[in-house]
From Swiss-Prot:
Family that this chain belongs to: Belongs to the universal ribosomal protein uS3 family.
Membrane-crossing segments per the record: none
UniProt biased composition (Basic and acidic residues): 229-245
PANTHER family assigned to the protein according to its UniProt record, in alphabetical order: 30S/40S RIBOSOMAL PROTEIN S3, SMALL RIBOSOMAL SUBUNIT PROTEIN US3C
UniProt keywords, alphabetically: Ribonucleoprotein, Ribosomal protein, RNA-binding, rRNA-binding
One of the record's GO cellular component terms: cytosolic small ribosomal subunit
Quaternary context: Part of the 30S ribosomal subunit. Forms a tight complex with proteins S10 and S14.
Stretches for region Disordered: 216-276
Any one GO molecular-function label of the UniProt entry: mRNA binding
Protein name: Small ribosomal subunit protein uS3
Low complexity: compositionally biased ranges: 216-228, 254-269
Database matches in InterPro entries: KH_dom, KH_dom-like_a/b, KH_dom_type_2, KH_sf_prok-type, Ribosomal_S3_C_sf, Ribosomal_uS3_bac-typ, Ribosomal_uS3_C, Ribosomal_uS3_CS
Biological process terms in GO annotation: translation
Annotated source species: Streptomyces griseus subsp. griseus (strain JCM 4626 / CBS 651.72 / NBRC 13350 / KCC S-0626 / ISP 5235)
């Protein structure tokens, strides 16, 4: 049943974070409706921009929108004209001041949403679906992915009856919660109808989301996260930092060990002399 669940929602709070960060009580439904409208606006007129995801963060009088895109030049436009137009439409939609941030996706071959869009564009250009799937899989594996699965569903090749086919390469765990599995979906518009493209990309195991947030905050502050060890306070009965591990002997410096070695060697020399 792992194939029926969206990997982002399945691992939410464990290895993935929320794409909308705000709190509301009575205005909850209005904010959800605005978020859907914002994301629909970003994907409707910018198919060529390669938008991976849109993150929304709200405060009392401001809305921050982060657009992750593979082609930031298309989103920004000439001298920032396109970015100003988007900001104006967002302010008109939300009625608040909008802070627009355009972020570049460094490795688009490993982003599931961008891979799904690339396959859909090839299907719209009448490229064979098998060739499009295999080409995208090869480029993703060369870019560093540990596993990838691509599935296309619809009237494949213009067939009268719709079906779905998938290709998989590498390892794609669907039920392992610590696995960093990216998921993307896009629809290709063809002359025979729409073809849905789903992409799963496995990038390796990650830590807990709380540890990741703590490490990122420590890195921004320039301090390393403190770890428990020999400097921790004493516990019950005064047993504290000296208990580094059971069965371990306390380490001594080489300077302290040298007199003990000389003292042990002196009686041995005396005993050999008496026997002679």
């Amino acid at each position: 049943m792992g194939q029926k669940v969206n990997p982002h929602g399945f691992r939410l709070g464990i290895t993935t974070d929320f794409k909308s960060r705000w709190y509301a009580d009575k205005l909850y439904k209005d904010y959800v409706k605005e978020d859907v409208a914002i994301r629909r606006m970003m994907t409707k007129g910018m198919e060529r921009a390669g938008i991976s995801k849109v993150e929304i963060e709200r405060t009392r009088d401001r809305v921050r929108v982060d657009i992750h895109t593979a082609r930031p030049g298309i989103v920004i436009g000439r001298r920032g004209a396109e970015a100003d137009r988007i900001r104006g439409e967002l302010e008109k939609l939300t009625g608040k001041q909008v802070q627009l941030n355009i972020l570049e996706v460094k490795n688009p071959e490993v982003d599931a949403q961008l891979v799904a869009q690339a396959v859909a564009e090839q299907l719209s250009s009448r490229v064979s679906f098998r060739r499009a799937m295999r080409k995208s899989m090869q480029s993703s594996m060369k870019a560093g992915a540990k596993g990838i699965k691509i599935q296309c569903g619809g009237r494949l090749g213009g067939a009268e009856m719709s079906r779905s086919e998938f290709y998989r390469e590498g390892r794609v765990p669907l039920h392992t919660l610590r696995a960093n599995v990216d998921y993307g979906f896009f629809e290709a518009k063809t002359t025979f109808g729409r073809i849905g493209v789903k992409v799963w990309i496995y990038k390796g195991d990650v830590k807990n989301i709380a540890e990741v947030r703590a490490e990122n905050a420590a890195a921004r502050a320039g301090n390393r996260p403190a770890r428990g060890g020999a400097d921790r306070p004493a516990g019950r009965g005064g047993r504290g930092g000296e208990r580094g591990g059971r069965g371990r002997k306390p380490q001594q410096s080489p300077a302290a060990e040298a007199p003990k070695a000389d003292a042990a060697a002196a009686p041995a020399a005396e005993s050999t002399g008496t026997e002679a």
